[in-house]
Amino acid sequence: MGSGEEPSQMRRALVDSLAGAISGGISRTVTSPLDVIKIRFQVQLEPTTSWGILRRDIYGPSKYTGLLQATKDILREEGLPGFWRGNVPALLMYMPYTAIQFTVLHKLKTFASGSSKTEDHLHLSPYLSYVSGALAGCAATIGSYPFDLLRTILASQGEPKIYPNMRSAFVDIIKTRGVQGLYSGLSPTLVEIIPYAGLQFGSYDTFKRSMMTWNRYKYSHLNFGSEDDSVSSFQLFLCGFAAGTFSKAACHPLDVVKKRFQIEGLKRHPRYGARIESSTYKGMYHALKEIVAKEGFGGLYKGLFPSLVKSAPAGAVTFVAYEYISDWIGSKAGVE
């Protein structure tokens, strides 16, 4: 590698990191209310639908029984700040997560394509896009995981709070689980993130290529003027929206298992239902079997609706913001 290429690659990595961090922060803050509701559903052992009210003799009373009911309950009991509970560790997690993810992704695509230009990366095979996305997701997860754990713990509690702030949750985890407790649930998280990140980035590239093909066809066959395959902001939004929906729907059961491992054995106010005791789940496969046995197959899809309502726009906002911020910073820094 020539010495002239190194500063350029360093600038490119800085652009990717900064654009990824900013886009991740915007996306996470905008969609935090839906993320809080999703997490409350995922860690609730009792049914999360109105059907649970009719079967409370079997399962016990359910705290949350639907998206609208949960929204009203959180607003009444915790006020508007309740919808941003855990947002500080979420930002501390998601900003470095997206920074690492987009930086590693660009590096992998540059290596695979032999070019650092983004437009050349679209010519990679779908298989390489999926693999690059999965590897980038793994690197980002390992680098930011303790904040993901703290986000889940703070977002899952309501009022009265068990942990008043991030520091108290951190201290209690160290005290009860040791330093390794900060990585509780990392294995199922990696099992989840490999297909999730692979599908998210792979499908985004696939949708974007399809959109460019449609644009070329539209301009050449439908008399729209000169040929142009550039993708508009709205089309980028649609690609991100579709990628977010597809990847989240496919991997949601693994996300439920991950959340259960993260709060296993931690304190929980009785108002929010049964506590998940330590060593309830002996492994990922055992957790899947236990959830199905005790909660039915629907237990694996708790929080799916708020998750999809959140993930689709979150994916769209992240990708669109990244594309534009990356282009803007790159133009200022003289990076292609």
From Swiss-Prot:
SUPFAM superfamilies: Mitochondrial carrier
One Gene Ontology MF term: thiamine transmembrane transporter activity
InterPro entries assigned to the protein according to its UniProt record, in alphabetical order: Mit_carrier (IPR002067), Mitochondrial_sb/sol_carrier (IPR018108), Mt_carrier_dom_sf (IPR023395)
Solcar repeats: 11-111, 124-210, 231-328
Reported tissue expression: Ubiquitous.
Superkingdom of the organism of origin: Eukaryota
GO biological process: thiamine pyrophosphate transmembrane transport
A cellular component term, taken from the record's GO annotations: mitochondrial inner membrane
Matching Pfam families: Mito_carr
Annotated compartments: Mitochondrion inner membrane
Its membrane topology: Multi-pass membrane protein
Keywords: Membrane, Mitochondrion, Mitochondrion inner membrane, Repeat, Transmembrane, Transmembrane helix, Transport
Ranges annotated as spanning the membrane: 11-27, 88-105, 127-150, 182-199, 230-246, 303-322
UniProt family annotation: Belongs to the mitochondrial carrier (TC 2.A.29) family.
Role noted for this protein: Mitochondrial transporter that mediates uptake of thiamine diphosphate (ThDP) into mitochondria.
Name this protein carries in UniProt: Mitochondrial thiamine diphosphate carrier 2
Species: Zea mays
